[in-house]
Amino acid sequence: MAEAILYKLTDSEGQTHGGGTNHTQWGAGITHEAKGPADGPLCSASWIHAYEHPLVAVLMNPIHANLKNPQLWSCRGEIGKRDGQLKCGCRALTTVELLPLPQITTEQRVRFAIGCAWPRASESWKKWVANWLSGKDRTAAEAAAEAAAAEEAARAARAAAAAWAAWAGFDLIAIAEWATTEKPIETLYPVEVKP
């Protein structure tokens, strides 16, 4: 497989696994190599964890590394193992440069959750979602309730994304990109939506 441009999250000091047995310091031009056997699991010393898109890195952070104040690095590496579309592993990874971290709003996290759940959702839920996305079904009380529940919904969405990532028609990068726009759901899933 050819070398790919990938993305890695570190803590605010450019480190991963702070204080652990796999503690690593990253920076521009730094390469690390996995020490475990190549047949080991992705989340182990056998593979160095990376992402194929910066938005996926940020959206998956709470259920993966859960780094506080993360930094985002562009990287180079050869993908040798995948967890669906959620993350990938390289035997060697080189961080190239520090990038601006995408800032994801609560509403964008909810849109990501919607995009992940849409393919398997009921028609009544899809109708409600179409109205929510268009702004038709957002009273002040609903907005307050949504804000209170949004973080939990986003966490559930990330878990749902993990479960659906192996589904053949699922494009996690397209969903993440769509979530940061105000485009209607039909641009992501071109099917008729009846509001």
Locate predicted features:
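Short, glycine-biased loop/turn motifs at secondary-structure junctions and
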Residues: 1-195
